UniProtKB/Swiss-Prot annotation:
Pathway named in the protein's UniProt entry: Metabolic intermediate biosynthesis; chorismate biosynthesis; chorismate from D-erythrose 4-phosphate and phosphoenolpyruvate: step 2/7
Identification of the protein by name: 3-dehydroquinate synthase
Location in the cell: Cytoplasm
Required co-factors: Co(2+); Zn(2+); NAD(+)
Primary enzyme class: lyase
Amino acid sequence: MQTLHVELGERRYPIFIGSQLDPEQLLEPYIHGQQVMIVSNVTVAPLYLSHYQEALESLGKTVATCILPDGEKYKDIQHLNLIFDALLEVGFNRDCTVLALGGGVIGDMAGFASACFQRGVYFVQVPTTLLSQVDSSVGGKTGINHPLGKNMLGAFQQPQVVLADMAQLNTLPERELSAGLAEVIKYALLGDEDFLVWLEENMDGLVARDADLLAEAVYRSCAHKARIVANDEKEQGERALLNLGHTFGHAIESYLGYGTWLHGEAVATGMVMAADLSQRLGWISNEDVARTKKIIQRANLPISCPQIPLDDFLGYMAHDKKVLNGQLRLVLLKQLGQAVITKDFDVELMKQAILANQHG
């Protein structure tokens, strides 16, 4: 087992990374009250819920559960209310812990519920997908979608602890595994060319679910994110770099309808668009773009999206949270392994990059 810490002063917390982790031993120091609400979904609960429920009950905790439908399209206010209903129906108080057992959607919703319930209760993350292990479970971003934009309602709510168990990735569908690899590739492109070289050498093993390689990828990804979050928790500066590919990707997700494409699939094509625009600006070479596309394709991810009317695409981009004083800012590549956030780009070149990476 490997351990990382997100350094946030008094709110410092560990990320435990390994296979067949022992929840009873690892969770005991981080469950502060007697009451635990496990939030999961209909896919994950039959696989792992009893394991965590029994571990918590053996610690003497009162455990209740809230099981939600599975999918991004349920990340809305109606389903968030089901978590509040469950907490209120069992009479949980301000010393309770909300434990997220699932992927990014469950983590986002359970975390947001924990931030809101009685103005804030304890929160624990047990991410069961690669994407949530390397990205959404670390750093405290929580929230739900609105019909006009992704993640428009939310809060920063740091967990007490994160348990990333590689054994849980064995039950992950191929498509979900690839979606997680998109976020792993993102860390390499935005800040670590050595990691990109490692991914190029080991992508076949990652796709084949080699547990040691997956643990290394999760560790290196979380280390990057932990460092950035420690420096910029509320995304006032450097943390925005973690949105490489996301402005384009969120537009794709929003237009196609949440859940049609997985988040990681949209981010993958978004990173291709960002690389394409970076090349058009003269920052990176054609070879760099080709290298970006190749590693994304080797992860079984899309490098273009279905045709989306340009006005619709730009409309969704205008709702992006990185818009500042009416100006869209994008995360682009100065070189592979070095991203910048900038408003200094030619909008016509951006339009060309969007259109060039769509298919009929």
